[in-house]
Amino acid sequence: MSKPIQIERGVKYRDADKMALIPVRTVVTERQELLRKPEWMKIKLPADSSRIQGIKAAMRKNGLHSVCEEASCPNLAECFNHGTATFMILGAICTRRCPFCDVAHGRPLTPDANEPEKLAQTIHDMGLRYVVITSVDRDDLRDGGAQHFADCISAIRRKNPHIRIETLVPDFRGRMDRALEILTATPPDVFNHNLENVPRVYRQVRPGANYEWSLKLLENFKNAHPDITTKSGLMVGLGETNAEIVEVMRDLRRHGVTMLTLGQYLQPSRHHLPVQRYVSPDEFDEMKAEAMAMGFTHAACGPFVRSSYHADLQAKGIEVK
């Protein structure tokens, strides 16, 4: 029996070390077992990377993090090249250890009290008009990090009065009422929380999370703020069926959600959950048609779609795929 990993505060645990801490074991994928990527999943990188390096430098200078880098998003080059980024607050170490996600797990450091002001200044310097703020899960905090979200929203608006803010929040497990009460004073323009996948595979995909709890979070926020858009998204290719995806879409509509994102899951490393299927662009188009027929005001459905992918265009109702 191998010796358990001693988790040290502030240390990032990734790949095999992270997966060793998950109660639901994942099997290392051998190279010959990997599904071959279809042509539509191949990305052409931009020739000029100066804008990309500029954004990375701005992040490093102010001690900030982007989910684009921490989660190894396939759209990083495209988004950074267009001068957009999704900021990740509350550090870069997550208290959860989901086997689909490339964000590091461990014992996080105390939140940086100066982060709200540094974030607001960076956004001002970048000249952004629409920004997405997300975070790692912080189960170690009594409010799940809600007050830090509120402080960031307030600081951003003070420095950038004309900006629109979308928050992509964790599930605030065991702290929903407290978290939503805190956010009532400074709500975002768009409230996003991802279901990630269908309930049948939750134990494998999101250990520690609960499908019904996440739906309730979205519904409770909407009930408290009926004029604010709520949004959610799923990754596909983790063993779910198209019929199950459609049923999740119905659940989201029943809980007041009007914006949807569907994108292809990509395995960050061979230690993570393997891709079980690649969903074709035609299938994504069919899912988008289903979503619009259900009453979603906007549905971004495509292989490279992520919840914050061209989020400004999504909020304007412009097609993204």
Swiss-Prot record:
Q: Name one GO molecular function term.
A: metal ion binding
Residues of the Radical SAM core domain: 80-297
Cellular compartment(s): Cytoplasm
Binding residues for [4Fe-4S] cluster 1:
C68, C73, C79, S308
- Its EC number(s): 2.8.1.8
Which co-factors does it depend on? [4Fe-4S] cluster
Q: How is the cofactor bound?
A: Binds 2 [4Fe-4S] clusters per subunit. One cluster is coordinated with 3 cysteines and an exchangeable S-adenosyl-L-methionine.
List of residues binding [4Fe-4S] cluster 2: C94, C98, C101
Q: Pathway of this protein? A: Protein modification; protein lipoylation via endogenous pathway; protein N(6)-(lipoyl)lysine from octanoyl-[acyl-carrier-protein]: step 2/2
Q: What is its main location?
A: cytoplasm
Q: Which UniProt keywords apply?
A: 4Fe-4S, Cytoplasm, Iron, Iron-sulfur, Metal-binding, S-adenosyl-L-methionine, Transferase
Q: Does the keyword rRNA-binding apply?
A: no
What's the catalysed reaction?
A: [[Fe-S] cluster scaffold protein carrying a second [4Fe-4S](2+) cluster] + N(6)-octanoyl-L-lysyl-[protein] + 2 oxidized [2Fe-2S]-[ferredoxin] + 2 S-adenosyl-L-methionine + 4 H(+) = [[Fe-S] cluster scaffold protein] + N(6)-[(R)-dihydrolipoyl]-L-lysyl-[protein] + 4 Fe(3+) + 2 hydrogen sulfide + 2 5'-deoxyadenosine + 2 L-methionine + 2 reduced [2Fe-2S]-[ferredoxin]
Top enzyme class, one word, equals transferase
CDD domains in the record, alphabetically? Radical_SAM
Cellular component annotations (GO), alphabetically ordered: cytoplasm
Q: Which Pfam families match?
A: LIAS_N, Radical_SAM
Record's family?
Belongs to the radical SAM superfamily. Lipoyl synthase family.
Write the protein's name: Lipoyl synthase
